Each structure stands twice: as structure tokens, then as C-alpha cells.
From Swiss-Prot:
It comes from Anoxybacillus flavithermus (strain DSM 21510 / WK1). PANTHER family: ALPHA AMYLASE DOMAIN-CONTAINING PROTEIN, GRANULE-BOUND STARCH SYNTHASE 1, CHLOROPLASTIC/AMYLOPLASTIC. It catalyses: [(1->4)-alpha-D-glucosyl](n) + ADP-alpha-D-glucose = [(1->4)-alpha-D-glucosyl](n+1) + ADP + H(+). GO terms for biological process: glycogen biosynthetic process. This is Glycogen synthase. ADP-alpha-D-glucose binds at residue 15. GO terms for molecular function: alpha-1,4-glucan glucosyltransferase (ADP-glucose donor) activity; alpha-1,4-glucan glucosyltransferase (UDP-glucose donor) activity.
Amino acid sequence: MKVLFVVSECVPFVKTGGLADVAGALPKELKKLGTDVRVMLPKYGLIPQHMRQKMKKIAELVVRVGWRRQYCGIEQLEHEGITYYFVDNEYYFKRDSLYGHYDDGERFSYFCRAVLDCLPVIDFQPNVIHCHDWHTGMIPFLLREEYMRNSFYAQMKTVFTIHNLQFQGIFPREILGDLLNLSDRYFSIEHLEFYGHVSFMKGALVSAHLITTVSPTYKEEIQTPYYGERLDGLLRARSSHLVGILNGIDDEIYNPKKDPYIAVPYDVTTIARKSINKRALQQHFSLPSEEDVPVIAIVSRLTKQKGLDLVKCVFHEIIAEHVQMIILGTGEWEFEQFFQDMTMTYPDRVRVYIGFSEQLAHQIYAGADMFLMPSKFEPCGLGQMIAMRYGAVPIVRETGGLNDTVQSFNELTKEGTGFTFKNFNAHDMLYTIQRARSFYEQKEIWETIMKQAMSRDYSWAKSAFKYNQLYDELMAGSGIYVHE
């Protein structure tokens, strides 16, 4: 089985979000199962110089972008057993950020065509092209409507993964002819038209052989108007070709037993050593080293989608529970400013780091007692899985992947890995924090919850097995896809 992953970002080369983690980890697990998986992404100017120096140019071609002809170089790099291909065009990709440019429609129209055009040139004929998010959404559409007439492409299948339905790649109608070389007949509700515009995401949803998303619950949610971002009707129509497969985490990177960033290594059998990491974290942030005061952590984008407005609404009540709070992230100015103000209001209780540091994130996971993630919606979420791996008990809203990964603690059976609430409501969240706080006082029960959380397997191995099944079933044409 030959699979080409096409992504707009990938660890360790360039990252803005969770997509990069998936693109970095899942191919490695698929390779362990015997799949010939390769990854293709743009050669951004932001890729570190030492990595760019290792790339080898293997092909040059010309790609159509409307009436223009644009240069395309293909560079190759072997990294940790995986072959990576980089689409090189400095005009499009040598920028100071990955996204958010006035010509993103043109940049990713070019990228989608470049991916398809280069395959015969580099002599790689994948069975499956696995595309991720809107940046690659036109690949399944162009393959179906144009490239499949060529025998080289005729047997290829496409899988499209929705990482976040909110970001859809919506552009003016003129993009069809000007950039995509497509006629106006495709500006229709059956094809690319989306409320008077062209949607790259919709292009993939109408044309991919199979659609996946990153958790079983999110798969169900996006078929409803509340979560469906105006695409719920289309997703319901394609529900027989829609599968939810939970993301994993890289359990080598996130391993408290071997983590080079934390003060003291520990695992589920030496869980008492976590308290040393807590003390180190408190000292790092110049907080009082109080063992009996729980540290609640937030490692997140500071946005309304992540539920930060709920936290803001009842922040004073949370601190009144006699807790310490540490926040790491960047986002909307409203929340950055609020949390910075709260460090002045509660100098012995609150710390915030506006920015992101991988090392500090690891130290927070290792030192925190609780991990707060009250998202409005969460396709999968990695933070709660990392937190459980480190014994930081998650407090989450029952949505998307949070619902699939965190089992709410049952005081009768003593089963569970965290605490959950259903409604997107600040006081429901506050009550859940208070409930967690009460069990924190019961050390034996709290240790049970921590151990149960740390014992869960959220590695990529299970997910990779399901994707491999999916590819096999797709190529077999059975029409019966993996059960979640």
C-alpha cells in the first residue's frame, strides 16, 4: 500500500497547530504497519535552515495557475525513516507566516495542482492520497474532475481529513477560472459554490472517496447545525463515507519517565515524584510552594473557541477555591490582557506566560494537579491526552474528542480519568472545578484518578491501525468502513 500524505504543515519542520503534530506522528506509525507512506508539504521559508540544507532537489516542472505558468521545484528529505517531499516556490512560500495572506487562494491553488502534477515526474504513484484540511481540499476535486482521465491517476483514491471544520478556505467566484482553470459550470451547489463563494473545503467534501475527522464524537457533531458550519447538510448526505478516528499523541515525546524537560522523571509506579515537579513549577513561576493547594493549568490558544470566556466569567470564584492557576498560550487580546491583569490582582495565585514554549509546556503538564479545557468545540484536542499521560487530571467539557478521551470520575465505582460537564456554561464549569477540588482533598481517591489517567493508551498505534484498515477497505471497494 502506497500512501501520500498532503499537508500544509508538519512537525518537525513547521507548526502552527495540531495538524502539524498529526502529520509528523501518524506516518511513522503507519510505516511500522508496512505502509509505504510519504509526506508532501510546501517548502516554507520558515523551515529551519539546517533542515533546508539537507534537502535534495529531485525534480523541476511548470504548474498552471490560471493563464500563468509557475515554477515548481520538488525537494526530498529522509527524516526518521519517512520520505518528505517539499514543493518549492519562493514567491508563494517564502513568507513570514504560513497563512493569512491576501493571496492564500492562489498559493494553495498552486500547491494542489503542484502535488498532482509532480507525481509522474518524481515517479511516485500512490494508491491513496490522504489530504488534510482546506489547504489541500482541491486535490480530490481536481483529481476527480480532471486528472483521472489520465491512466496514471485513474486508480487513485482520496481520503480527506477534517481537523477543524471552521476553517474552510472560502474565496471569490473568480478563483475558478483565474487560478484553478475550472469552468463556471463548477460554480454550482453540487460542486464548489458556497453561499456565493468558492469553498476549498466543500470541494473535498463533495469529491473525496472517503472523509474522516479526528474523533467519533466530532464526526457526529459536525452533522448538526450547531457544529456543522453550514456544511452539516452535505456531511449528512455523505455520512456513509464519513468516519471518526481519534488522534493520538506521540508517547515518546510525551513521556514523563524520559522527559528531558522536567525536574524529575516519574511514571505510574512512582507517581509520588510528581510532587517534586509541582514544587519546581511553583518555584519557576515564583508561586508559594504549597503542596495542599492544587495547581490548575491551561495550555491553550486563548480564544472563545477554547472556552476562555467561561474562565473569565467565573475567574474570581475559581481562585476563591484556594487554588493556584498557571496559563500558557497566546490568542485574543481580550484574554491575554485579562489574565495579565489577574496576575496583579492575585500575585500569590495566578501566573501567565503569553507565548509558547515547548519546554515550559512539558513542565506545566508534569507539575500541574489539574488541566482545564472547557472548549466550546474541540475536534480532537491533544492537551487533555498529554495531561493524562502526565497525571494532570483533566477538567473538560463533553464535546468532540474531549468526550471520547476523558471518562468522568464516578464516585460509586471509583472509575474515571477526569471531570466533565455538558453545557457550555460558566457555572457548570465552576461546579465541576469545585467537585474536582473536593476529591483533591481525598488523597487516596485522587491518586486513583491520576493512576487511571496515566494508564490509558492514547498512542498513535491504535489510530494508525484504523487508518490502515480504512485504506485497505477503500482499495477493496467494500464500502464497509472501520467501526470507531
